[in-house]
Amino acid sequence: MWRKHKKEKMNSNLIIACPKGRLEKKVVKYLADRGLEMEKAFFDDEIRKLTFDTNFKNIKVIKLKPSDIRSYIILGAADIGFVGYDDILENSSENIVLLQKTSIGKCRISIASDRKKIDFSEKKVFKVATKFQNISEQYFRELNIQTETIKLNGSIELAVKYGVADFILDLVQSGQTLKDNQLYENVIINNDISTVIISSYYAYDTKKVFIKKLLTKGL
């Protein structure tokens, strides 16, 4: 049962950025396992508020789109946040401290096409549909394969079927979505993608004890 702690564990205030969507419940469980519980309103989809109290007076939780969490951390609006490791690989990690890798949302980054095997010698330039432009360009540059990146943000699996791209580079979890769209997983680029916990250097520097306690022993 959710209840307020009369005695605060630490003097510092802490703002935690929680991703909306499919990983939300797992992040909430992760925090609950460490002694942090959200107020009842957090679980009410009818309520539009995005900042929530917890059972510690000095800890607030904010709900954000996963793609926005990194910006909130860098700008100092949140102290710690949960993001995909793919976000760290795709974007500059400057001013970001990687605190902990979790097993939440474990998946991989793969190349997929409508062929069982891709022959990279059959074309001079391949079209790649992906939301991970930097990861894609770095990978193919290291292999000396010329590509044109088609930047998409959703329904990437359709790109091959409708001739937008020769293959896609995307996150794969079970592989069922690829199968449903008649695609084959050709190459696994990174098999170790999951949710990670990040902070800014400033927040970690000024609230290190508080943050470490939450992420290790619990509150």
Predicted regions span which residues?
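Domain-level signature for soluble enzymes in the chorismate/prephenate branch of the shikimate pathway
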Residues: W2-L219
